[in-house]
């Protein structure tokens, strides 16, 4: 069937061409019928590598499409647009004669085909697989493709002859029309799963969609830096290829960091240069002065000579013992604090100095130093504070005199309790604080009783700024520096303990102070103290005593009678004495009272004792921990002891904190009948009142008339 069809088509094409044929074209048209069977195998072997390359890089074009490529290509003068050839047109299996004729007759057409094919840019299936499938499904297309193959071999080559006439163009147009119709018939047998012709330009393949999605993800801009991963990887690869470092995979992270750092740029929109010094470097620069040796600036040589040898405590030794107890600040920070305390003792006339502890804050922390000035050194500062208070009181009195007189109020405010003098009670020691070692030390003001009373009713976190306001209810009289000083006084009074017998009262001053104020407020070290066994300090709380005075409910360590009056007032009110004005004197726990007498907190002991090590008890130390003030610790090795606090400065409370209830409303002015409002009378009451008044008037008139009559009778 194939052999009969192809000569017939060949004959029809020869008749259409007519006179355009040349003598040598007839030979090429007739010779393949007899010469090809002998040379088909060598030609196929020669064509194999070329067709294999073409199938990988171009569409699976059938011989039919190859025959019309010169007509529909860009070189054709008559065609304005390419022929509507399907990119996935099914290819039929050509006869053994077709490959040979294709190589002999149309080598330039294959070149044109390969030049047009890459413009599509769409992957296509293997032409061998497609042709095998179509050979099974559409056998009737084989004859058509073979016929077109013979036509392709018999067509004249105008580019070889260099001549084109009208008849040749007409024949080409007819052949093109015939091929188009034949392609439409062949396209109708397409598989439904294959995409439509020209669909690659409208609907991209799944591979292209995946690539586009991946690239879009890499191009996603970061919300923090404003860069994307695609550009970052491109810059990294460019840097690696330009520099070509050894073992690039090992320094890949460093290269990434260098590329990111290259994008950083300074801001030039500021009027002044920005200070890029970090707080860590700033404090490091200040701490350099702590490590300098020699004479400090602003310190007299005479003052250095007068400083006592025992003014500076051995903080590192105390830190060594607290480290065994599992408490401390670390060696580095402790040594910096040690140097900061040395700077404090070198610049102030301090007789005794002690590292009190560290109070934590929200923004910054407080390092607290407890000092005691030498005799007569702190009097000038106390006098300046008293002068400032008197000045404030004088200004307030002057303002009161200038104001208009108002109705006198019967409310009497409670008398302000004065603060304790320096070196006594809650103001026995002076406290310096700083936020970091190396920063300047700031002296805290003395505490007043009202601040301690209000501090017991509120609970505030420290910020680390001494000038920060304290917003609370009840209102606190002062800022954060006053609140810090009040909390330090409370913590010291409740947690500073020592082994029993380490301190003793003075023999001479003890009786006088006890008679005068009802208690002793001073003590001294016992030179005959031989120490207590560590195991005894752990087993019994009676071997620990308080060596700081207890603070009374009025905010003082020594009782102050707020009802004391002047002699004139006492003489005037001797006749009218009221028992309600009498307030019983409050007496706190005396000094050196054992801590075993401390009250429990809802069945929780106020103190917890333990050994620093149960594995080596013969070298362990006794550790005492406060449950009332979390963060307060004390240690003792039998002869030495030390107290230390690190915490937020809050007292333990079993219940959640609740602000106090506002006090009841006081009666500001007395209410009498002259200002008391009465209800309006009713009509009946008004009538009864008028009748009563009329009756009274009538009775008065009758009495007057009777008196007049009696007088007239007397004259007669």
UniProtKB/Swiss-Prot annotation:
Ranges of Acidic residues composition bias in the record: 375-389, 506-516, 701-716
In-chain residues carrying the UniProt-annotated modification Phosphoserine: 396
Tissues expressing the protein: Expressed in trachea, lungs, and testes. Very strong expression is detected in nasal brushings.
Biological process annotations from GO: axoneme assembly; cilium movement; cilium movement involved in cell motility; epithelial cilium movement involved in extracellular fluid movement; establishment of localization in cell; maintenance of ciliary planar beating movement pattern; radial spoke assembly
Transmembrane residue ranges: none
Polar residues biased stretches: 140-156
GO cellular component, one term: radial spoke head
InterPro entries according to UniProt: Radial_spoke
N-terminal signal peptide: none
Comp. bias regions, Basic and acidic residues: 8-25
Principal location: cytoplasm
Alphabetical keyword list: Cell projection, Ciliopathy, Cilium, Cilium biogenesis/degradation, Cytoplasm, Cytoskeleton, Disease variant, Kartagener syndrome, Phosphoprotein, Primary ciliary dyskinesia
Composition skew (Low complexity), residue ranges: 29-42, 54-66, 80-100
Compartments in which it is found: Cytoplasm, Cytoskeleton, Cilium axoneme; Cell projection, Cilium
Region (Disordered): 1-164, 375-410, 506-526, 697-716
Disease: Ciliary dyskinesia, primary, 11: A disorder characterized by abnormalities of motile cilia. Respiratory infections leading to chronic inflammation and bronchiectasis are recurrent, due to defects in the respiratory cilia; reduced fertility is often observed in male patients due to abnormalities of sperm tails. Half of the patients exhibit situs inversus, due to dysfunction of monocilia at the embryonic node and randomization of left-right body asymmetry. Primary ciliary dyskinesia associated with situs inversus is referred to as Kartagener syndrome.
Family according to the record: Belongs to the flagellar radial spoke RSP4/6 family.
Subunit composition and interactions: Interacts with RSPH6A.
Its biological purpose: Component of the axonemal radial spoke head which plays an important role in ciliary motility. Essential for triplet radial spokes (RS1, RS2 and RS3) head assembly in the motile cilia.
Name this protein carries in UniProt: Radial spoke head protein 4 homolog A
Protein's organism: Homo sapiens (Human)
Lineage: Eukaryota, Metazoa, Chordata, Craniata, Vertebrata
Gene: RSPH4A
């Amino acid at each position: 069937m194939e052999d009969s069809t192809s000569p017939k088509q060949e004959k029809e094409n020869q008749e259409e061409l007519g006179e355009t044929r040349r003598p040598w074209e007839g030979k090429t048209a007739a010779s393949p019928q007899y010469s090809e069977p002998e040379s088909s195998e060598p030609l196929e072997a020669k064509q194999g590598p070329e067709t294999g390359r073409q199938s990988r890089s171009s569409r699976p074009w059938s011989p039919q499409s190859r025959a019309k490529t010169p007509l529909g290509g860009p070189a054709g003068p008559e065609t304005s647009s390419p022929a509507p050839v399907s990119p996935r047109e099914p290819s039929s299996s050509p006869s053994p004669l077709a490959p040979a004729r294709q190589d002999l007759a149309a080598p330039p057409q294959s070149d044109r085909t390969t030049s047009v094919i890459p413009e599509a840019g769409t992957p296509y299936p293997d032409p061998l697989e497609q042709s095998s499938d179509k050979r099974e499904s559409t056998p009737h297309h084989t004859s058509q493709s073979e016929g077109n193959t013979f036509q392709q071999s018999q067509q004249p080559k105008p580019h070889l002859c260099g001549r084109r006439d009208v008849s040749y163009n007409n024949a080409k147009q007819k052949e093109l029309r015939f091929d188009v119709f034949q392609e439409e018939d062949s396209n109708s047998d397409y598989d439904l799963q294959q995409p439509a012709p020209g669909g690659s330009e409208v609907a991209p393949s799944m591979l292209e969609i995946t690539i586009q999605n991946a690239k879009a993800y890499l191009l996603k801009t970061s919300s923090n830096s404003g860069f994307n991963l695609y550009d970052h990887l491109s810059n990294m690869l460019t840097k690696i290829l330009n520099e070509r470092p050894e073992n690039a995979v090992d320094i890949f992270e460093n290269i990434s960091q260098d590329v990111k750092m290259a994008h950083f740029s300074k801001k030039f929109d500021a009027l002044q240069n920005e200070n890029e010094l970090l707080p860590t470097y700033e404090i490091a620069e200040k701490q350099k002065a702590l490590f300098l040796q020699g004479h400090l600036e602003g310190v007299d040589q005479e003052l250095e000579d007068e400083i006592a040898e025992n003014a500076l405590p051995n903080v590192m030794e105390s830190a060594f013992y607290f480290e065994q107890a599992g408490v401390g600040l670390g060696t580095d920070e402790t040594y910096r604090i040690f140097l900061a305390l040395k700077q404090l003792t070198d610049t102030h006339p301090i007789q005794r100095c002690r590292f009190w502890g560290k109070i934590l804050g929200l923004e910054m922390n407080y390092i607290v130093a407890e000092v005691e000035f030498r005799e007569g050194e702190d009097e000038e500062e106390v006098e300046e504070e008293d002068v400032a208070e008197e000045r404030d009181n004088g200004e307030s009195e002057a303002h009161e005199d200038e104001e208009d007189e108002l109705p006198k109020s019967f409310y009497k405010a409670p008398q302000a309790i004065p603060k304790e003098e320096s070196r006594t009670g809650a103001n026995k020691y002076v406290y310096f604080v700083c936020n970091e070692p190396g920063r300047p030390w700031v002296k805290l003001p003395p505490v007043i009783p009202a601040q301690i009373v209000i501090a017991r009713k509120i609970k505030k976190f420290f910020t680390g700024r001494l000038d920060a306001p304290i917003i609370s209810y009840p209102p606190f009289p002062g800022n954060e520096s006053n609140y810090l000083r009040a909390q330090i006084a409370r913590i010291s009074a409740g947690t500073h303990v020592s082994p029993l017998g380490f301190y003793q009262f003075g023999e001479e001053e003890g009786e006088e102070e006890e008679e005068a104020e009802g208690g002793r407020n001073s003590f001294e070290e016992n030179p005959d103290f031989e120490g207590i066994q560590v195991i005894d300090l752990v087993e019994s709380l009676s071997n620990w005593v308080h060596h700081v005075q207890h603070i009374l409910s009025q905010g003082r360590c020594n009782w102050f009678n707020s009802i004391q009056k002047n002699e004139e007032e006492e003489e005037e009110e001797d006749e009218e004495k009221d028992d309600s004005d009498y307030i019983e004197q409050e007496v706190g726990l005396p000094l050196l009272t054992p801590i075993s007498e401390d009250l429990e907190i809802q069945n929780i002991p106020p103190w917890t004792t333990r050994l620093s090590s149960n594995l080596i008890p013969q070298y362990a130390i006794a550790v005492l921990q406060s449950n009332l003030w979390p963060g307060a610790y004390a240690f003792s090795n039998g002869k030495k002891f030390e107290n230390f606090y690190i915490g937020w400065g809050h007292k333990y409370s079993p219940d959640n904190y609740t602000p106090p209830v506002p006090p009841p409303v006081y009666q500001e002015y007395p209410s009498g009948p002259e200002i008391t409002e009465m209800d309006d009378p009713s009509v009946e009451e008004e009538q009864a009142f008028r009748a009563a008044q009329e009756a009274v008037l009538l009775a008065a008139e009758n009495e007057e008339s009777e008196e007049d009559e009696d007088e007239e009778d007397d004259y007669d």
